[in-house]
Design a protein with these regions (language model features):
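C-terminal membrane-solvent junction of multi-pass transporters and transport-like membrane proteins
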Residues: 351-363, 398-445, 476-486, 623-624, ...
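Extracellular loop-to-transmembrane helix junctions
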Residues: 50-97, 102-111, 122-150, 262-268, ...
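Hydrophobic alpha-helical segments of multi-pass membrane transport proteins
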Residues: 179-186, 334, 339, 344-345, ...
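Extracellular/periplasmic helix-exit of transmembrane alpha-helices
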Residues: 185-198, 256-295
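Membrane-interface "cap" regions at the ends of multi-pass membrane proteins
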Residues: 1-46, 88, 97-102, 219-221, ...
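Helix-loop-helix junctions that connect adjacent transmembrane segments
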Residues: 17-18, 174, 178-234, 280, ...
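Cytosolic C-terminal regulatory domains/tails of membrane transporters and channels
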Residues: 1-18, 472-713
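Loop-to-transmembrane helix boundary motifs in multi-pass membrane proteins
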Residues: 27, 102, 141-149, 245-268, ...
């Protein structure tokens, strides 16, 4: 018989290839490009929001131009600690879960998921507006179509794989760095003589306003501007989340990436805010504040007597817009990493922890990408609306992260001689981030902040319900394991190696581990077909999810685990006098792995009958059951049957079983032979009942005769 081959729409990859992690991992420079673009692109809307908040008191921009870089380095210093403590990635979610508890981790993760959706949406919307501002005004009305098209393109390239998408976007990132370095550097150097005047005017204005309004007013205005420009900081989290995709040594690579990011963000954001003040720019109809600034800086530029200023401004705006698309890509890249970590902890459906055969969390990419499309359609792609929703959630994560670090260093004060300095960094970070969070919620609550908090609360609630469901299922399967494993000898010793018969009938079992479900399936099949089956074959698929895709060591541990479970099935079968063997494979795709295993089983045992077990919990069935549990057994069953092979899914009811058989309400006809058999059986049953009644009556009569009556001697 020919070896069965399923239709192949995906390309299998050897997960044990030692070059795989090297090829997919990112050096510090590529990580800066792929994960740092979110922060740098925020210069398109973060600094302008800060400057707009100072309306009438623009002189305070000097303090913000200094304060923004300081706060960036404070937060990034805290995240350098996160990278050192958690080199396998996880960022703020893992930090909060480990240092503050699972529920804090759920809140942090939910906030990050919503924030990354908004990152993708606002970045695409801002980038589209930046590009369309260089086009005829009639094009502006079509921006929502452009937004959706760009998001769909980003989803596509991310489904192709992490490193490939970064290589596509690398030229854009470098063009942004080049144009902005030239433009901002020239702007500062050409007006350096104005610095003394700016300093003098700032001191004079501070004195005047402090006398007129008081120092509290000035401090409050600075803090309000900080909070409204909170989008400037949002990209700092991405590096800590993505440490596990960086090249070894991961900690050093991650910290170098964080240093590159913090330095570049501080220079760009601080320079922009100072240049707004230096060039006295103000917003103009149809132009962003950055566009006005770039035009002012390049005014009078010529090359060979030909005006070059407008062209330089155009090129700079184009690179700015394209970098915003890279930032959207960062949200789509990083959110699935957070979701995969949450799925491993069972706050999200377990399928989000699976990687596709291109080593991308396919489900997460699709969900985040299309959620961003929905947000864009709901808001019409208006940046003014999106920016209100944007910066709250990341500061929830920042605050929880810094609180967790502070708690950790306090607990380590007797073990770590450097705990005081590290605590000072994390505590300062907590004060900064908590202050910005509180002010942002206060300022933006009525303007749409309530919606962001509501959506985050809904995600938290759903995560808790999902966790409760999985916990209930785990309890049920544990009870099943306890019941079924009682049939296994305490010290399972393998019997003699019985010869396999490749030409004989073979029962093939899809199992995941040596557990109650697998044993129930095996014993049920043995009871049904054991009379003619010659071989028992077990197929195990080691699924490489986010938890295992962290290096060869984790994969080797997975291999040892799978083979140990398989050998237990073999030992049990041989102990019972059954010829058995097993096959195992390792893949990022469960269905693909089961297909490969079925192909191999049929190659060696052409007369195969397939079995798989399924836990039936009728009390837990609901409309979302299919989302929480992958029904891959049914998919494989359908494909096997299509190719002419039988597969039985053996159910095991664990609760919610009806107490009596269901009523039969339809009239049922039967063949005369069966009716005759039934009549004979009825007659036999009636005779048995009569004989039993007669025997019981005789026994009672004998008892009465042998019992003395009252009053007799």
């Amino acid at each position: 018989m020919a070896w069965l081959r399923f239709p192949r729409f995906r390309r299998a990859v050897n997960v044990f290839n030692p070059k795989l992690f090297e090829n997919l991992s990112l050096a510090a420079f590529l990580a800066w490009v792929g994960l740092g673009s979110d922060a740098l692109s925020s210069s398109a809307y973060g600094p302008p929001e800060i400057y707009y908040a100072l309306k009438g008191h623009e002189y305070l921009a000097v303090f913000l131009a200094i304060g923004i870089p300081i706060s960036v380095f404070v937060i990034s210093a805290g995240y350098r600690q996160v990278i050192a403590l958690f080199p396998d990635g996880g960022g703020g979610y893992h930090t909060a879960s480990t240092l503050l508890g699972p529920k804090a981790g759920l809140v942090s993760g939910a906030a990050l998921i919503v924030d990354y959706v908004l990152t993708a949406a606002i970045s695409v919307a801002s980038g589209t507006e930046a590009l369309l501002s260089t086009m005829p005004a009639s094009w502006y009305g079509e921006r929502i179509l452009v937004d959706v098209a760009i998001l769909l393109f980003l989803i596509f390239i991310n489904l192709r794989g992490m490193k490939e998408s970064i290589k596509i976007l690398l030229p854009i990132f470098m063009a942004f760095i080049l144009t902005h370095t030239i433009l901002l550097g020239w702007g500062l150097l050409s007006h350096v003589g104005a610095v003394p005047d700016i300093a003098y005017n700032t001191v004079a204005s501070v004195r005047q306003d402090s006398m007129q309004y008081g120092w509290i007013f000035i401090v409050a205005l600075i803090l309000r501007a900080f909070s409204l420009g909170g989008g400037t900081y949002t990209g700092l989290e991405a590096v800590a989340n993505g440490v596990h995709i960086m090249r070894e040594p991961r900690v050093q690579t991650g910290q170098r990436t964080m240093t590159l990011l913090a330095t570049s963000l501080s220079l760009v954001a601080g320079s922009l805010i100072f240049l707004y003040l230096m060039y006295h720019v103000h917003g103009q109809q149809g132009q962003t504040l950055n566009a006005v600034l770039y035009g002012a800086i390049t005014r009078g530029w010529t090359v060979g007597g030909i005006p070059f200023g407008p062209t330089a401004t155009l090129l700079t705006l184009i690179t700015e817009g394209l970098l915003l698309f890279i930032a959207a890509n960062t949200g789509i890249i990083t959110a699935p990493i957070v979701m995969a970590n949450m799925a491993v902890d069972r706050w999200l459906p377990e399928r989000f922890s699976y990687l596709s055969d291109r080593f991308v969390s396919r489900n997460g990419v699709l969900l985040i990408g299309f959620a961003a499309v929905v947000i864009l359609l709901m808001t019409g792609g208006h940046v003014s609306i999106l920016v209100v929703l944007y910066s709250i959630n990341v500061f929830i994560t920042f605050t929880l992260t810094m609180a967790g670090l502070s708690r950790h260093w306090l607990a380590q004060r007797d073990k770590d001689p450097l705990w005081r300095g590290r605590l000072a960094v994390s505590a300062l970070g907590f004060v900064v981030t908590a202050s910005i969070l509180a002010i942002t919620i206060f300022e933006k609550f009525d303007a749409g902040g309530w919606f962001t908090l509501l959506v985050t609360a809904i995600v938290v609630g759903l995560g808790y319900l999902i966790y409760r469901h999985y916990k209930s299922i785990s309890k049920i399967t544990a009870e099943l394991d306890e019941t079924m494993l009682d049939v296994v000898p305490e010290h399972l010793e393998s019997g003699p190696n019985l010869p396999l018969d490749p030409r004989g009938a073979t029962a093939v079992f899809f199992v995941s581990r040596f557990d109650g479900l697998g044993l129930h399936t095996l014993l049920t099949a043995h009871r049904m077909v054991g009379g003619f089956v010659k071989n028992y074959v077990f197929l195990l698929a080691g699924i490489v999810g986010q938890g295992e895709f962290k290096g060869i060591k984790a994969l080797e541990d997975l291999k040892v685990y799978v083979e140990t479970e398989a050998n237990q099935y073999m030992a049990f079968c041989r102990n019972e006098g059954m010829a058995a063997t097993w096959f195992a494979t390792y893949s990022t795709d469960r269905i693909l792995a089961m297909e490969e295993l079925a192909n191999v089983a049929i190659r060696y045992f052409p007369q195969s009958i397939f079995f798989a077990g399924r836990v039936i919990d009728t009390s837990a069935q609901g409309p979302f059951h299919g989302l929480l549990h992958d029904e891959v057994s049914f998919i494989v069953q359908d494909r096997l049957q299509h190719d002419g092979f039988s597969m039985m899914i053996v159910p095991v009811h664990v609760r919610g079983i009806p107490s009596k058989p269901p009523n039969i309400v339809l009239p049922i006809s039967m063949s005369p032979d069966l009716e005759l058999v039934q009549n004979e059986e009825v007659k036999k049953e009636e005779a048995r009942v009569r004989a039993a009644a007669k025997a019981q009556a005789t026994t009672q009569a004998n008892i009465q005769e042998s019992t003395p009556h009252a009053g007799t001697e």
